[in-house]
Design a protein with these regions (language model features):
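Glycine-centered, small-residue-biased loops immediately flanking beta-strands
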Residues: 304
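C-terminal hydrophobic helical "lid"/dimerization subdomain
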Residues: 16, 20-34, 65, 244, ...
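NAD(P)H dinucleotide-binding glycine-rich loop of Rossmann-like/cofactor-binding domains
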Residues: 129-215
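Glycine-rich beta-strand-centered segment in the early N-terminal region that forms part
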Residues: 52-69, 83-133, 155, 174-178
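Acidic carboxylate diad motif detector
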Residues: 309-310
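Mid-domain Rossmann-like dinucleotide-binding core that forms the NAD(H)/NADP(H) cofactor-binding site
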Residues: 118, 178-265, 269
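C-terminal substrate-binding/catalytic core of Rossmann-like NAD(P)-dependent dehydrogenases/reductases
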Residues: 268-273, 313-366
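Helix-to-beta-strand junctions that scaffold the AdoMet/dcAdoMet cofactor pocket
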Residues: 300-301
Length: 366
């Protein structure tokens, strides 16, 4: 069996990366074996392995033929061994939780009107228990028993096929109603979903004459700028980063103002000029370092909100006096739920969301 004919899509421009794996048209499996890129040792390159194709053992299960799988920083944390204590998994492990593809096989109890073989689907990655209060209210991704593909005992999508524990975790994308491709859908399941939920949490604070800042224009920030425009009801969108090239990307998707934090001695002074002394009403921190939170607090308006989605740091520190006196709100936001993924895909169908993708072979995955 030849594994190297898979394609790896990557969007990279001066350090901004969104990766997807797309199966090549000429890939041929041998028997019941499939190809997967797996972690054998933390901090080491992924290895291309021949493994057994997953089989259905439960009536709700579905096998998806992978069309594309995104690589986000959570995967890199896993591959590098940064999360051995937070998310212990048995090795070897196939990473990849941003997955889109086609239904290959369905279990016996999957309703016929839900999905069928051949359907294009996006895989929702928060596989909750379905019974707890969080799952019942629709927030499966924060279920205490949630399993994530590639980040739990379930293997992920750096493979030809993915076993999904229930059809309920699949969003069917009607091919007749959209020109979306798997490589466009895959990043939406996390990189495109996480900032959407975060902005939705605080959209009541936005509107005309309001200001929202996106700190960190990587994969999450790239989408975050777009959602701030879509959901902000006329609010000014400020993009903050250390790279002029990334800030140019932000301008291209709707940022009204850009600030290179590396070149500013007093960012609050610049913010005051832009906002006429008000400060920023909402900050989306896609980085999650102490320095970015300090920046967020420094530029925040009274009664403003900071939503943290980045996981680069280890702890959050906030000034108690300012937080109380100015009624700051500081909250975390994890991923997004199934219904929010459906909303994101609908926006993508209407071409409200921009994508940038390149391709190269899986043999260059490392």
């Amino acid at each position: 069996m030849q594994c190297t004919v898979l394609l790896l899509d990557i969007f990279t421009r001066n350090g901004f990366i969104v990766m997807t794996i797309q199966m090549g048209k000429n890939l041929e499996s041998s028997g019941n074996n499939i190809c997967a890129a797996r972690i054998h040792k933390y901090g080491s390159p992924l290895e291309l392995d021949d493994i057994r194709k997953p089989t259905i053992s439960s009536p709700e299960e579905v096998i998806v033929r992978v069309g594309a799988t995104g690589l986000c920083h959570s995967d890199l944390h896993l591959i590098n061994g940064d999360w051995q204590k937070r998310l212990p998994v048995s090795l070897p492990k196939t990473p990849g939780h941003e997955v889109a593809g086609w239904v290959e096989e369905i279990g016996a109890s999957v309703p016929k009107n839900s999905i069928k073989e051949g359907d294009l689907v996006a895989v929702f990655g928060g596989w909750g228990c379905g019974h707890c209060i969080y799952c019942k209210r629709g927030d499966e991704q924060i279920c205490q028993s949630a399993k994530w593909p590639g980040l739990s005992e379930y293997d992920g999508g750096f493979s030809e096929y993915l076993l999904v524990p229930s059809y309920k975790f699949l969003v069917r994308v009607d091919g007749r109603a959209t020109s979306l491709k798997p490589e466009e859908l895959a990043p939406l399941t996390d990189a495109g979903l996480t900032p959407y939920r975060a902005i939705k949490k605080v959209r009541h604070l936005l509107g005309p004459n309001k200001n929202v800042a996106i700190i960190g224009i990587g994969g999450l920030g790239f989408y975050g700028v777009q959602y701030a425009q879509i959901l902000g009801s006329g609010a000014n969108v400020l993009a903050i980063d250390r790279s002029d090239d990334k800030l140019e990307l932000a301008k291209g998707v709707g940022a009204d103002f850009t600030l290179n934090i590396a070149m500013l001695e007093g960012i609050r002074k610049k913010i005051d000029i832009i906002t006429h002394g008000q400060g920023v009403d909402v900050v989306l921190d896609t980085v999650g370092l102490e320095i970015t939170l300090d920046t967020a607090v420094n530029i925040l308006n009274r009664n403003g909100a900071i939503v943290v989605v980045g996981l680069f740091g280890r702890e959050i520190k906030a000034p108690l006096f300012q937080t109380v006196i100015k009624e700051f709100q500081i909250q975390g936001s994890l991923w997004g739920n199934y219904n929010e993924l459906c909303e994101v895909i609908e926006l993508a169908k209407k071409t409200k969301i921009k994508h940038q993708i390149k391709k190269f072979s899986l043999s260059k995955v490392n």
